[in-house]
Structure formats: structure tokens, C-alpha cells
């Protein structure tokens, strides 16, 4: 039950005059400049669509650290998981045309599709692919595609080895690889690749001429923003993630100029001018709650953001804010973060793309939402910075405990050379540990970026020092057989703030020779 205090929060400060919400906030440009400085992000591009009109499509800051080239509305960003709504829109078109149904079994179209249990495999539907209720753990299979040379088909095939962490359809756990499988249904039905279907059925009709289906689709002259992250306390340029091998989950590259067109067709229930891309009924389906998401209490500075409901729909998340339903999604890859937000009953859409890693896109989204919903302004920059400080303090406390547990006085159970060798994990594949210059070096055989020196931590535990600086380090824990040989090694992320795509905990490497 919603208490009176909560209702007071929802309706607090509705003071803007009638008509004010048809315009952008005053001093918005100055507010964006302040946010860029506060969050240490080089640049952002923002689009706002209201009542069928593009109120804003503009860049702020710069495209690259150390370069004065200004950000603009045509700069390209990786939009990461904002791609998922494009994939479900493609499937919705096929539902409209009678080519498939959301509740069709996946194996009807992908006969080789297989998961951890024969019954689950048989019962698994297209809807299950796109609603994060598979029974697999959070981010299951992400290390199969992250910086790897596996093809999309091989990534999907290897998921049969992923172990469940809950019952099928019992709880929410975000999964990227299953969206790649959803995308593979499109060529099975139409003969067109996911990439070509997106181009023909969405990008071309909407005139989204600046949007690319992945890194391989980039063309000479494309204005791609540079990715940035804070490493070792300093803002640095980081390599672009190439995620074409799970394209339907995360690979689209776009600008706010193009995404304003995408938001407009969403808010008009699939209609673009006189042409309809998908039906109003499919819009309702894609925006309907499918999998309940757990609601956690936010940090105190963000208490007002605690929703009354939260769920995953079809390629979108849905929740409430100040009495309105939000349809939204975020996207994040190395050095680039973004968010798309729709408020259907206000015919409002907001897109924020950034070339850094921070909650800047959240702060600016809520500033714009408050303005257009007629709420009293809040300092969302300060609120999200306070929350981030709290998260870092908690993580630092946990890391401090871990560091104090390091025991380099303990002796290794085996000579270093006995830990070296070739290992295999049923899900990921092969890895090698080599003895080089008196130390151990771990290599993931299908992920060239994952090469790391193993630093002894104590008690047959090592910590990776990946040579690619923006990868999340992991503990490598060896288990020995009674006779003294290595039985296996497992891994887990060092930092509590590590992105869930570093699903080291799912790996169990055993000697393969």
C-alpha cells in the first residue's frame, strides 16, 4: 500500500505554469556544461521529443579528450543495450505479419537451440528470449562475446553449457546472449540477417541514415565519438568495444539526430508519418510488464526514485515516476553510456548519449523529466554524485577487507611450473597459463584482450593484472587433488562494482592435458 508520505513525494512541487512544459528548461545548456564538469565526462549529445516535435538535438562538450572538436548532434555513439528495443520491434513486425508469435517455441525456428535442461529447451519461447527470465544467472555467457573472436552462432551454441541459478521463469536475471538468439530468428524466418532487416524495416523508413548496425558497418567519414573511462584516478581514452558477435543485444551505433526519429515512432505507436512500421497493439505488447524486477531502496539522496512497480517488458524496462509510467532502457559499453526514456502519456521522449562512464545521463534525464512533468527543480547532479560516493565508499570498504586478507607469507602448495598448462571450461572453452620470466601469465584462448599476469595473493590464490587496462581484474583460485596436482581453478571479480558482464564466477577451468 502506498502511504500518504509517498503520495506527498509523488505530487510534491507541481508548480510550473501551464505551457511551460512545451519548452526546454531555462539555462539548460549551462546545466549540461556543469554536469560534464562534475562527472568528468568529455561530451554528451541529447535529444528531446515532445508532442511529435524535436525540441532538442544537440551536442555538448567535445568528442575526444585533448581535442577541441565539439560534440554535435550527428556524432555517433555505441548505444549498447538500447539496441534491444530495435530487435523486439523487428520481431513485433513479424508477429504483425503472421510469420511468428511471441509464444512460439524457439526450437521451431532454431532447431539447434539448447539450454541446460531438455524440458526448458522445449518450452523456451521467443518471449522468454527477450524478457530475462531464463533461470540463468545475471549476465550468463557474457564472457563468450566480450572481446572474443567467437561468432554469434558459436556464442549461442555454447550457452547450452551455462548452469542455471534459479528456476525457469521464476525471477529476473539480465542476459545478453539470449537477445543474440532472438535476432537469429529473423534470418530463419525472412532469409535476411538481423543487420539487413534492421536496415530495411527500421532505418530506411525512418531516414536514420547515420545509424550503423555495428563496428563492421562503420564507413569512412563517420563521426564516431571516442570512448573514455577513469583509470588509475585519471580520465583516459579506452579502446572501443566490438560487440558485433551479439549484434541484436548491443551493437547499434547511432546519433541523437537519428534516435529522435526512433523515439518519435515509438511515441506514435509504430507510425512514421503515413506509414506504419508495427501495430499499436504490438506497441502495447512491447511496453507491457513481462518479468517483475526486484525493487531496492536507493541511496538516501535518490530516495524519491524508488518506484512502486518495476518490470522488464519486451526490449524495454517499465516503472513509475511521479505518477507516470516510464518506458526506458540504458546502454553501457567501455567508455560509453546512454539512456532512452519515453513518457507515453506526455508524448515525451529523451535520449542522452555520453562518451564517458558515469551517471550523468541519469542526472540529466531526471532534470528533464521533472521539468516536463511540472515538478519543482532538484539538483540531480548533486544527488547522483552523492549516491556514487556512497557506492564507492562501500566498495572501498569491501576491497579494504579483501586487501587485508592477502597473505603473501603463506607458501604456494606447488612450484609455479606445476600451475602452468592448458585448461578448459565447458562454457567458455580453452585458457592457458604459462610460466614466463619467473611468473605466471593467464590467457583466454578466444579473447585476445584477456592476457594477465598472475600476482600471488596467498593460499593458492592469485589476482590477475590484465595487460589491457580497462578490464576488471579477477581472483584465480586453484584447487588441488589429494595427490598434489591441480584439479581446477575458478575465478571471481575483485571489485564489488565490477560490471556483471565479467561473469567470472560461472567459469570452472580443469586441466585439459
What are the language-model segments listed below?
Residues 62-176, 183, 190-192, 200, ...:
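Active-site-proximal loop and beta-strand segments within enzyme catalytic domains
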Residues 125, 178, 255-258:
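An acidic site on a long C-lobe helix of protein kinase domains
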